[in-house]
């Protein structure tokens, strides 16, 4: 691959054919390393590239994930296969299971024109970076927080998520259990998301029926009796006769 553009990322995708995905500032290209198509020139997959640190691989789907300012995109060797709208500048991306991990740059960098005089790189050390975990399947933000420092590295290992900050700290994140996730959704009255989560996790019918009933109780308290009855009917196996 010959290009005048800076290469911002490299990822291998191994299947029947081993493909190298190459990102530059203005395009995504593929180059077959072994298998059918080996020896052919690199092929442009997308006329939009990404920044350094914004190309990664989903180990579960084997898709290549690209984070841009407008959205997060997934690719296979044939082209784009999915996109998830999430606007804002991105500095780093990584995957944990089927979650997309994103780090956004410090506010002082994204708002550079409005900074007061006398500022310098030292100020950025104390600026906040935003760390976000997206669940594309459920179309929700699973976690978001402001970090008091820039981020040097973002990765997952040993079943956990790690962030290394510019000031030398290592932050570790552990995924909540299924029951803990449900409790959070119940507290926020996100019952439809709770149902979707249960179906995604393929929990048994008894557990799903408990969620239907909780949703029915919530709707009944709100006075939405018809919809509440629909949920009770879905959970009929776990509903005691009145």
Question: Which role fits each region the language model picked out?
Answer:
Residues 1-103, 107-155, 169-212:
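WD40-like beta-propeller blades
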Residues 138, 159-160, 239-242:
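Extended alpha-helical solenoid scaffold regions that build the rod-like backbones
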Residues 156-157, 220-227:
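Alpha-helical linker/edge segments of TPR/alpha-solenoid repeat scaffolds
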Residues 184, 214-222:
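Residue-level signature for tetratricopeptide repeat
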Residues 194, 225-229, 241:
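Solenoid-repeat scaffolds in large eukaryotic assemblies
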Residues 201, 235-236:
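Alpha-helical solenoid scaffolds that mediate protein-protein interactions
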């Amino acid at each position: 691959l010959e290009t005048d553009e800076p290469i911002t990322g490299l990822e291998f995708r191994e299947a029947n054919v081993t493909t190298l995905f190459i990102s530059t500032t203005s395009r995504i290209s593929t180059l077959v390393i072994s298998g059918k198509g080996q020896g052919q020139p690199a092929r442009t997959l997308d006329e939009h590239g990404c920044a350094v640190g914004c190309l990664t691989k989903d180990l579960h789907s084997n898709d290549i994930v690209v984070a841009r300012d407008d959205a997060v995109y997934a690719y296979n060797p044939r082209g784009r296969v999915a996109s998830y709208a999430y606007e804002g500048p991105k500095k780093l991306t990584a995957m944990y299971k089927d979650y997309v991990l994103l780090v956004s740059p410090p506010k002082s960098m994204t708002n550079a024109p409005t900074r007061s005089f006398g500022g310098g790189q030292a100020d950025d050390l104390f600026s906040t970076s935003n760390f976000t975990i997206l669940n594309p399947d459920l179309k929700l933000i699973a976690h978001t927080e402001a970090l008091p420092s820039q981020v040097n590295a973002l990765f997952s290992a040993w079943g956990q998520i790690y962030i290394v900050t510019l000031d030398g700290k290592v932050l570790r994140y552990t995924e909540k259990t299924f029951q803990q996730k449900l409790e959070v959704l119940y507290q926020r009255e996100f019952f439809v998301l709770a149902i979707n989560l249960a179906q995604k996790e393929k929990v048994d019918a008894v557990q799903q029926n408990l969620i239907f009933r909780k949703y029915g109780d919530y709707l009944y308290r709100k006075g939405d009796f018809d919809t509440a009855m629909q949920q009770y009917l879905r959970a009929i196996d776990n509903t005691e006769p009145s």
